[in-house]
């Protein structure tokens, strides 16, 4: 699990290995993200940037609009939660990134997604 707070936007992520959807050389992980507006000004998530690293040091960058087809607008005190997935070639790695947020007044900033592990249970000492 990881948590980061940037300008009142809290991002918490939990990841889970999905053995039923994995096979040798293809390890599927789901991750659930909770984005909460703990600040005093509404903000909208407009885009995402993920950096995915595997155990071989391979790096993949994923950039796109919104999350799961949405660009959630969060009033103070509101939160948005979604689940997505990632496939690695190795049994462990990590993800991190940012969400581009825009306040109702037009101020844009990047909310940090702190690094979180993607690990097949029993593969690390």
Swiss-Prot record:
<dbReference type="InterPro" id="IPR050718">
    <property type="entry name" value="ApaG-like"/>
</dbReference>
<dbReference type="InterPro" id="IPR023065">
    <property type="entry name" value="Uncharacterised_ApaG"/>
</dbReference>
<dbReference type="InterPro" id="IPR036767">
    <property type="entry name" value="ApaG_sf"/>
</dbReference>
<dbReference type="InterPro" id="IPR007474">
    <property type="entry name" value="ApaG_domain"/>
</dbReference>
<dbReference type="Pfam" id="PF04379">
    <property type="entry name" value="DUF525"/>
</dbReference>
<protein>
    <recommendedName>
        <fullName>Protein ApaG</fullName>
    </recommendedName>
</protein>
<feature type="domain" description="ApaG">
    <location>
        <begin position="3"/>
        <end position="125"/>
    </location>
</feature>
